[in-house]
Amino acid sequence: RIERLAAQLQNQICFYGAYQKNILRAGVVLFIHRDVVHAQYSAGDNNRDDGSLDLLLDFVIKKYNPEKVFSFGTSSEEFGSRLNKGLLYWKESFRSCNDTQPFYSIETKNYYLLENRLR
């Protein structure tokens, strides 16, 4: 669960919310690393026209800039085989640039082969 992970990684995982009259309108869970802030989960309410998620992300980007790079995460689906053009367009509205990334599938029984490479 995310609560358990956040408890183990204090100051590295945090939640920001945008509220209107004490009602949560948008939220984002950030994973904070030495050089990068990564938006792991973000969501707005059903009324996307109010811009609450846009406002919230603008706030967190400005909060961590220029010390860290802000990562919106992937814009693809189905293990990178399909680009979500709407999501990419939305991210680019924040002047983000996109890049491709490889996807790998590794049997969990072979995890030990990666231990020294991921540190």
Place the predicted regions along the sequence by residue.
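Alpha-helical elements of Rossmann-like donor-binding domains used by nucleotide-donor carbohydrate transfer enzymes
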Residues: 4, 55-59, 86
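Short, contiguous acidic/charged loop-to-helix segments that flank catalytic cores in large enzymes
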Residues: 43-50, 76-81
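Conserved acetyl-CoA-binding loop-helix of GNAT-fold acetyltransferases
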Residues: 48-62
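Active-site/acyl-donor-binding loops of N-acyltransferases
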Residues: 67-119
